[in-house]
Amino acid sequence: HDHAKMQLFLARRGGRPVGRISAHYDELALEQPPEQGMGPGTGNWGLFEAEDEAVAHALIAKAEEWLRNRGMTRVLAPISLSIWEEPGLLVKGHDHPPMVMMGHNRPEYESWVERAGYTVAKRLLTYDLPVEQGFPPLVNRIVALGEKNERIRIRPVDKSQFKRDAAIIIDIL
């Protein structure tokens, strides 16, 4: 987060925490073309939790104000600090366990955020595939093509070189 600016907010009622939110923007993302999703003037809020709709709206308004005061003219949210962390709201599948790098929130957040003026920017999907069933044929075909391509190397992570391999994975993502 060397190139990001952020402010954290905590809502209290009677001295007791009842919600939280982050307001943030990535200076590198501001330089991207808007067609790539961010672009000039785009800020975000995330790390969102609220006890009720009134708290939710107060926190969202505070995050929007902070972003506006720093020149942001558009808000893409919720995104927890980076698009590479937890983007979006879970709107279906609350009966399933959380997925890696995907938000998992209370069902009512969808309507609270919509009533705060937000609409869907992009639908994100996760899939639950029991490993004992193996991969679908399409995935197997893609892997086979990759194995035949001399420019692609498929190998397990080398635990003795974990930092190096983690950097490679992050670079790919």
Task: Indicate where each model-derived feature is located.
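A short helix-loop-beta-strand connector motif used in the catalytic cores of GNAT acetyltransferases and
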Residues: 1-13
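Conserved beta-strand in the GNAT
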Residues: 10, 16-26, 44
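Secondary-structure transition/capping motifs at alpha-helix termini
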Residues: 14-16, 30, 68-70
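Glycine-rich, positively charged N-terminal anion/phosphate-binding segment
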Residues: 23-37
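Feature marks short, surface-exposed loop/turn motifs that line or immediately flank catalytic pockets
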Residues: 27, 81-85, 133
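Acyl-donor binding region in acyl/amide transferases
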Residues: 34-122
